[in-house]
Every structure is written in C-alpha cells, then in structure tokens.
Design a protein with these regions (language model features):
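N-terminal acidic leader/helix
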Residues: 2-35, 56
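Short, charge-rich amphipathic interface segments used for partner binding and complex assembly
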Residues: 28-73
C-alpha cells in the first residue's frame, strides 16, 4: 500500500468513522488507530473504560468495517 493510500484511509477513519463509532457507543470510544502492513489492515478501537477491539479490513471494505464496528458496539 502506498503512503497516499494509507493517508486517505486513515483520514476516513479519523474524520468519518470515529464520530460514528462514538455516537453509536455513547462516546465510550477513546480512540481509533489505523494500522497497515503488507499482509493486513486493521483498525484498533480503544474504549475509555478499558478494552480493545481489533477489526480486520481489506483494501476496499471500509463500508464493511463501519458495519462490523457498529455491530460490535451495539
């Protein structure tokens, strides 16, 4: 994945997905972290009360990511 692709995905996560997740989970989400390697892409969700969720994503499945996150926090 190029640096540009990483930056675009990370920006989406932080500007679009984080507010959605916080609203869905009543602001219990402390932070989201986007990680990418040659083998996988992962969004790590850290909750304010403790706990972490790792959500695996593929290069073209940000919608699936949003749906998966919403299922996990509801």
């Amino acid at each position: 994945m190029s640096q540009l692709e990483f930056n675009v995905k990370a920006k989406f996560i932080y500007t679009k997905l984080l507010p959605l997740v916080q609203e869905a989970s009543r602001s219990d989400v402390d932070s989201l972290c986007y990680e990418a390697s040659d083998d996988a892409e992962t969004v790590v969700i850290h909750y304010a009360g403790g706990g972490t969720v790792h959500v695996d994503v593929t290069a073209d499945s940000l919608v699936a990511l949003a749906m998966d996150v919403l299922r996990k926090v509801s």
